Amino acid sequence: AGNMGGSIARGLAKGSLIDDSDIIVSNPSAGKLEKLKKEFPGISITNSNVEAATGADIVILAVKPWFMEPVMRELKLKSKQILISVAAGISFEELAHYVVAPEMAMFRLIPNTAISELESMTLVAARNTNDEQDKFILRLFSEMGTVMLIPEDKIAAATALTSCGIAYVLKYVQAAMQAGIEMGLRPKDAMQMIAQSLKGAAALIQNNDTHPSVEIDKVTTPGGITIKGINELEHNGFTSAIIKAMKASK
């Protein structure tokens, strides 16, 4: 019930595939658990990881990577259970070393912080799973945004675009807000303008299945203000900076 774990628990409770009464959440912080329980009275809460995992069909571990080994060794998960790890950087091979039954079905889940708004771009990798399990997990997390099943060896690159990438998008929002304020706009108005522009840009490429350059060409008239701004971005290394940031995050 930490930041990411709490967001996932809330998403599950809001969704239609799992009843609140089938959700049990563990966290050492009584305050966080009580807050979650107040929002969703139907769920169960505990400060015992073992109690939460015992008898569960699906166990979601949303703990820091350095806590994964001790937590998993304590749980002694059974082969019939499904493990979902949200710990970044912990491979399936490592997870297999931490469990009693390395043949158990495992998923690695990489959401981003927008999962709290049910708008996450969530990456999923699978090991020792069948089609039915894959489909259920994808359906489950599609209620919290968009889900993509990818090979484990693509997780690092994809994480740079999604989990890290959302911070880079917000950095652009922050910079654009500063520009708007300098030009005389109120901060709240500037933020709303930029946020809606981002939603619109995403809709253009998603709904029309077009390349960004196609949509850019539609607004860059010869001698116009947009092409002047784009050229200024490139003069200052905008594209190069984005690529370097993504590669640095891999």
Can you describe what each PLM-predicted range is?
Residues 23, 33, 52, 68, ...:
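Small-residue helix-packing motif on alpha-helices
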Residues 24, 30, 40, 49-124:
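Rossmann-like NAD(P)(H) cofactor-binding subdomain of soluble oxidoreductases
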Residues 8, 12, 33-36, 71-75, ...:
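Hydrophobic packing residues within well-ordered alpha-helices of enzyme cores
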Residues 44-51, 148-150:
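Short acidic-hydrophobic, aromatic-tinged amphipathic segments that line or gate anion-handling sites
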Residues 94-105, 121-158, 169-207:
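Internal alpha-helical scaffold of NAD(P)-dependent oxidoreductase catalytic cores
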Residues 1-47, 55, 119, 181-183:
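NAD(P)+-binding Rossmann beta1-loop-alpha1 motif at the extreme N-terminus of oxidoreductases
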